């Protein structure tokens, strides 16, 4: 049998969900944004105008999740879709000023939650956490590429 409490994928999934729920309370309750909508807004704020396919990669959401989030955000006047000047078959999405303003309101609140979580660690532990996440992430990507 498997010991889930010692199984790395399970432990990471539980941690990821807990951290995500802590953060999503901020934008969900106060700003009525879903997790997917927030991820799209944050990706656009970070990387700028992008194709929906790039948003899917940037947010780790699937195309349908991105499509639903983009539709709602567009309806709320936070983003806009437009024709890709380089390829008229594609559409690009970009933040509108109200979307940028919303991100500016949400980010400090999210950062405060993350700071609270990380305050449990001393500086050396934080540095180690960053290094471990990077190393395990690189190895996971290596296995994904290998198939």
Which stretches of residues belong to each language-model region?
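C-terminal regulatory/oligomerization modules of transcriptional regulators
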Residues: 1, 124-147
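Pre-recognition alpha-helix immediately N-terminal to the DNA-recognition helix
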Residues: 22, 39-45, 101
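Short alpha-helical elements of helix-turn-helix
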Residues: 9-10, 33-42
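Charged, amphipathic alpha-helical coiled-coil/dimerization segments
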Residues: 26, 49, 71-134
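N-terminal leader segment of winged-helix/HTH proteins
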Residues: 1-31
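A short acidic, leucine-rich amphipathic alpha-helix
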Residues: 55-56
């Amino acid at each position: 049998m498997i010991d889930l409490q010692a199984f790395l994928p399970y432990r990471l999934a539980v941690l990821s969900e807990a951290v995500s729920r802590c953060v999503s309370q901020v934008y969900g309750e106060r700003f009525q944004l879903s997790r997917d909508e927030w991820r799209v807004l944050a990706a656009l704020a970070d990387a700028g105008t992008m194709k929906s396919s790039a948003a899917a990669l940037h947010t780790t959401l699937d195309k349908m999740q991105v499509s639903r989030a983009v539709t709602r955000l567009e309806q709320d006047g936070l983003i806009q879709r437009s024709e890709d000047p380089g390829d008229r078959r594609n559409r690009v999405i970009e933040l509108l000023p109200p979307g940028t303003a919303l991100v500016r309101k949400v980010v400090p609140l999210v950062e405060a939650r993350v700071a609270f979580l990380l305050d449990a660690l001393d500086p050396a532990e934080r540095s180690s956490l960053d290094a471990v996440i990077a190393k395990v992430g690189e190895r996971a990507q290596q296995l994904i590429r290998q198939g």
